[in-house]
Curated annotation (Swiss-Prot):
GO molecular function terms noted in the UniProt entry: hydrolase activity, acting on carbon-nitrogen (but not peptide) bonds, in linear amidines; manganese ion binding; ureidoglycolate hydrolase activity
Annotated keywords: Endoplasmic reticulum, Hydrolase, Manganese, Metal-binding, Purine metabolism, Signal
Entry function: Involved in the catabolism of purine nucleotides. The sequential activity of AAH, UGLYAH and UAH allows a complete purine breakdown without the intermediate generation of urea.
Organism the protein comes from: Oryza sativa subsp. japonica (Rice)
Disulfide bonds: none
Protein name listed in UniProt: Ureidoglycolate hydrolase
Annotated compartments: Endoplasmic reticulum
Pathway: Nitrogen metabolism; (S)-allantoin degradation; glyoxylate from (S)-ureidoglycolate: step 1/1
Recorded superkingdom: Eukaryota
Cofactor binding annotation: Binds 2 manganese ions per subunit.
Amino acid sequence: MATSAAARFLAALAGAAVLLVLLGGAAGAVVGHDDDAAAARRTMEEFAGFPASDYRGDGGGGSGGSSPFYVDSDGLQRQIDELASFSDSPVPSVTRVLYSDKDVQARRYIKGIMNQLGLSIREDAVGNIFGRWEGSEAGLGAVATGSHVDAIPFSGKYDGVVGVLGALEAIRMLKRSGFQPKRSLEVIMFTSEEPTRFGISCLGSRLMAGSEELARSLKETVDNQNVSFFDAADSAGYKMHPEELHNVFLKKDDYFAFVELHIEQGPILEKEGIKIGVVTAIAAPASIKVEFEGNGGHAGAVLMPARNDAGLAAAELALAVEKHVLESGSIDTVGTVGILQLHPGAINSIPSKSHVEIDVRDIDEKRRNNVIEKVHQSAIEISKNRGVLLSEFKIINQDPPALSDKSVISAMEFAAKQLNLEYKLMISRAYHDSLFMARISPMGMIFIPCYKGYSHKPEEYASPEDMANGVKVLALAMARLSLQ
């Protein structure tokens, strides 16, 4: 055996041994005991034919150490930067909207990395992308991970992207270490987690979870340029018949577990100096659209007692949302009036129409729905008191919250402990594809800190160290789940 070949062979064995020790021998061995490490080392030397100390590796990405079980942080950051270049807005912002040219370029980039890793790649009718590493028992439900790469206008380059590129780096780590999965491992790039183009959050994962309602509504869905969903998909290379949407639906036994790596999008981990967040539940939002109609008129000629102001009705409802949310008595209940539009929108014209969009979230579905009902009653009362017409009060979506599965939480906690990383059990208050994957698979999420909790803005940032920690926890958790 040539020296270089022997070194590579030993490197793989060393990585497998390190992973074996971290995983507890995959058969109940006590993790971290000197006897286990020594036994693994002796096995490596026996197979390689020369002492393990002969191997020296650079660790990759500046991480150091002789084990192939490392994160190539430099390579991961480079990929994040390259993916960010596929944007319809100037640096440092990222804008990547569903089925746009930049979205298509990003998809090609992700598939290119999957191909380099030797994953088998498939795409469904709406463009969810799957890269699978076949396990030794491929008939078993797979262990999946992944996230999204679409980006709202003028946002940052880490939201979702860390969960896709980081997942691919986790697969690369496991392959490099010599790990052999029992259950197949799969990385998913979900289509349109953001609602930017068609007003539908988590479009791809929602369909994967079997949403008949969404499949029906997409037949009539258009964007703000009156381009239909199917025409937009066709322009990106996804030509389909409406009935093909049912082919996107997955069965509950397709996946044994799903784990998503994501930046926190909040300040808690950074503020408390904790490296890993283990998500126990995802708060589900309800979206509401409200419209009032009044008489309008000239801002100077119509006296105050004679006015039926649709704008003031909207303003009063916005305050009512805040009031009812605070009355819930729970810190986990939040409400946001994210859109308030007035017509005709002139400084010297009394608004004749107002349009309000409201987001209410909670991990307790009953409590959240109670807030929504109170907001509805307030809208009715405001309409009567102000003499305006409540022309629409429509609940756009009202998704149930999701709890992380105990088995996935256990795997994530195990991984963090083995890596000596402090972790915190926490709730996700942001929407994620995991919310819908929980309908078809045991689910869990790994959070890493992000700078000042910033997200959906150009200042969004996660450090290489924090990303590496998240990737390592993901890799170990997936490996453990794969062997079950």
